[in-house]
Amino acid sequence: MSQSGADPEQRQQASEADAMAATFRASEHQHIRYNPLQDEWVLVSAHRMKRPWQGQVEPQLLKTVPRHDPLNPLCPGATRANGEVNPPYDGTFLFDNDFPALQPDAPDPGPSDHPLFRVEAARGVCKVMCFHPWSDVTLPLMSVPEIRAVIDAWASVTEELGAQYPWVQIFENKGAMMGCSNPHPHCQVWASNFLPDIAQREERSQQTYHNQHGKPLLLEYGHQELLRKERLVLTSEYWIVLVPFWAVWPFQTLLLPRRHVQRLPELTPAERDDLASTMKKLLTKYDNLFETSFPYSMGWHGAPMGLKTGATCDHWQLHAHYYPPLLRSATVRKFMVGYEMLAQAQRDLTPEQAAERLRVLPEVHYCLTQKDKETAATA
């Protein structure tokens, strides 16, 4: 009997037998991968990259941004919403967020009256950090010393706020696609009296791995990726940049120190210099991928501060996550909807393919290359 004449159960059994007989190729066949850091799975469906795109196309990014706009509340000398005037800063500038999500003096909600309606106190502070006085630059277009100043400021604010709060979250939302309406180069710093959900998952996962294997999870992971090489994007004397085996976003990367470091303030001067150079190279590659100012959300995760310092945090390894949404071009992004919201994360492009595309990109910014060409043409 031909398969077309078989009943549905026979056809399913035949299909499963064919699948088992085929040679698995991660670049061609769907599979799920485990994220040991955040204890979750991602569905990888590489064959979907062949499908035509008929979904939403984002508008082209604004080509020019004024270097200084007196009405921009992040510019030097500008007046912010609360009436305060920014100083004429020429480097980094840290100030209290005028519309904070966390405040230090919120009242205690008291005990919950039912286990299904738990409420706990949430206190903290929110700050904004400008990277540069000019609105028309981004981190990849800044100099290495300027980026080093940002890293020093990150370390300082982590130490300062960490003296009072166990979790200090540094994060940057770059581009309107990631909800950033102000093009001025800046990040945010939220410190809280509680560990957020993702920090709690990373705490549990790293503690469990350390208990079972006697070494930090991410330190061992970095060593393994250096041996395997296929997901590496950049390596330097002190840092590793890779597309994680379990990456969810198309060109997601993980930035890791080579040695065991728990928190940003622990980085040596040499490691900070190297980090500045590595960040510039990575973010230049991002911009060069689709020749656009590449949007992303990024942030640092390190061992909790305050009472959770010392030997109890030996399982932690400092790291930065970069989550860029672009998938096929400067105007086609990945959406986290439907299956991702109701079941689990899913991606099309494999992490290995993404790493290869980033790895081969030049480390000179396309804007600078274009300017050189224009200069040569008019010479």
Curated annotation (Swiss-Prot):
It holds the Pfam family GalP_UDP_tr_C. Pathway: Carbohydrate metabolism; galactose metabolism. The keyword DNA damage does not apply. The active site is at residue 186. Its EC number is 2.7.7.12. It is an enzyme of class 2 (transferase). Its cofactor is Zn(2+). It catalyses: alpha-D-galactose 1-phosphate + UDP-alpha-D-glucose = alpha-D-glucose 1-phosphate + UDP-alpha-D-galactose. UDP-alpha-D-glucose binds at residues 81, 97-98, 173, 188, 334-337, 339-340. Residues 1-15 have a biased composition (Polar residues). Zn(2+) 1 binds at residues 75, 184. The keyword DNA repair does not apply. Binds 2 zinc ions per subunit. Keywords: Carbohydrate metabolism, Galactose metabolism, Metal-binding, Nucleotidyltransferase, Transferase, Zinc. One of its GO terms (molecular function) is galactose binding. Gene3D superfamilies: HIT-like. Zn(2+) 2 binds at residues 202, 301, 319, 321. Residues 1-20 are annotated as: Disordered. Belongs to the galactose-1-phosphate uridylyltransferase type 1 family. This is Galactose-1-phosphate uridylyltransferase. The gene is Galt.
